[in-house]
Amino acid sequence: MKLVLAIVVILMLLSLSTGAEMSDNHASRSATARRDRHLSPKAWPCGGVRASCSRHDDCCGSLCCFGTSTGCRVAVRPCW
């Protein structure tokens, strides 16, 4: 009888700890989704070729910013 009671208590504790981990993971996922939504292309649009830019992050993909007058361009080397 004591053995059965001990097993039941252990299983209850395991289910409680697993439930806490699942809720923590859910909170982490929702925070990640919120961050991704704020950093989505709609929130931070990038520019294509000849788009106005002031830094490399303003240009899409492998394009680099060559100043406000030149804009985003394809570079032979990685952006510096």
Curated annotation (Swiss-Prot):
InterPro entries this protein is in?
A: Conotoxin
GO CC annotation, single: extracellular region
Copy the domain comment. The cysteine framework is XI (C-C-CC-CC-C-C).
Tell me which tissues or organs this protein is expressed in: Expressed by the venom duct.
Question: Which family is it part of?
Answer: Belongs to the conotoxin I3 superfamily.
Maturation-removed propeptide residues: 20-42
Protein's organism: Conus caracteristicus
Just give the chief location class: secreted
Source species, domain of life: Eukaryota
Q: Where in the cell does this protein reside? A: Secreted
Keyword vocabulary terms for this entry:
Disulfide bond, Secreted, Signal, Toxin
Write out the GO MF terms: ion channel inhibitor activity; toxin activity
Name of the protein in question: Conotoxin Ca11a
